[in-house]
Amino acid sequence: MPVGSLRAAAVLLLGIAQLPPSSAAPRNGSKWTYVGADGERSWFKKYPSCGGRLQSPIDLHGDTLQYDASLTPLEFQGYNVSADKQFNLTNDGHSVRLNLPPDMYLQGLPSRYTATQLHLHWGNRNDPYGSEHTVGGKQFAAELHIVHYNSDSYPDISTASNKSEGLAVLAVLIEKGYFNPYYDRIFSFLRYVKYKGQNVRIPTFNIEELLPEKPAEYYRYRGSLTTPPCYPSVLWTVFRNPVTISQEQLLALQTALYFTRADDPAPREMINNFRPIQNFGVRLVHASFQEVQILPGTGLSVGIILSVALAGVLGICIVLAVCIWFFRRKKGSKKGDNKGVIYNPAIKMETEAHA
C-alpha cells in the first residue's frame, strides 16, 4: 500500500478514536428516556412523529365526547390462554412487558387485530399518579395497555406500526383500592425482571381477567403510540371503568424495577414512565355509552345538581304560594268580622227638637 494511503488510513482511525463519547450508544442501550437529554420533551428531535398530529395520550372530557350507538362490545378471542403454555415476562428498559400468543385477537373492530404484548405505565411512591390517559382531568395510579396489530392487512406488528389504524390498543385505567389477584399474577414475578434485559417464564392465565367490569363501556378515538416513534397509527379503546389494585401492589410496581441493566454504574429506578397529556386538536372521542357529566369539585352529576336546583326553586315557589294564601285568608277574615253590624245614625228625640 502506498505511504500516502497508509497515512490517510492512520488519520481516519485517529479521527474515529477521538470522536466524543456522546456519539456512542448509551450504556443501557436506550435510544430515548422519560427525563433528561433524551426525555419526552426532546423525542421529536429524533422521532418527528412525536411532535406531529394525533398524539396520545389525551384527556377524555365532556366537550370532546360524542355518543356512538354503532360501537358494539368487543369480543376477546383466545384471551383465556391454555394452561400448558407459558408467558414471557421481560423488563424492556421502559416498562415491564408480557408477550402474548398469536392466537389471541380482537373482534368487533373494522379488522381482526392480533395481540402481541401488554405493558404498564405508573408514577412513583411520592406522587402515585401515573396513568397516561386522564378522565375529566383526573389522573389514575397506573394504566395497562394491551397492544394488537391489524393482522388482516399486515404480516407483523413492525409492518403495521406506522400504518393508519395499523394498531389497536386496549387501555385499562388502574386506581388504588382492593387487592387484585389477577394483576398479582404479573406483580408477583417483578423481582425476577428487576433490570433491563432480564426475563422470566410465568404461568399463563386468562388475560380477560385484567379487564374492568362492563367492558362494553369504553371511549374510542384515533391517536398514536405513547412512546417513540409515536406513530399516529393507533385505534384506542379506553375502558370507562377502572380496576383496582392494593397499596402494596402499587408500591411493588413503583419500586421493583430499573430502567438500567444490572451492571450499569448509575442505576435508575423505573418510575414515572408515562407521557404527559397531548394536544387534542380537532378530534372527537366516541363513547359507547351515554356520558353522565360530573361537575368538577362536587363528584355529582350535572343531572343530579339540576334536579336538586329545580326542586329547590319549586320548594320556594310552594312556600311563597302558601304565604300568599295565608295572607289573603287573613285579610278576608278581617272583612268578615264586620258582617251583620248595622250602622244607625243618631236620631234626636223629637222632644229634644222642640225644647
From Swiss-Prot:
It catalyses: hydrogencarbonate + H(+) = CO2 + H2O. SUPFAM superfamilies: Carbonic anhydrase (SSF51069). Its EC number is 4.2.1.1. One of its GO terms (molecular function) is zinc ion binding. Gene3D superfamilies: Alpha carbonic anhydrase. The keyword Transcription regulation does not apply. It is a single-pass type I membrane protein. One of its GO terms (cellular component) is plasma membrane. Glycans are attached at residues 28, 80, 88, 162. It is an enzyme of class 4 (lyase). Substrate binds at residues 226-227. Zn(2+) binds at residues 119, 121, 145. Keywords: Cell membrane, Disulfide bond, Glycoprotein, Lyase, Membrane, Metal-binding, Signal, Transmembrane, Transmembrane helix, Zinc. Its main location: membrane. Reversible hydration of carbon dioxide. Belongs to the alpha-carbonic anhydrase family. Homodimer. This is Carbonic anhydrase 12.
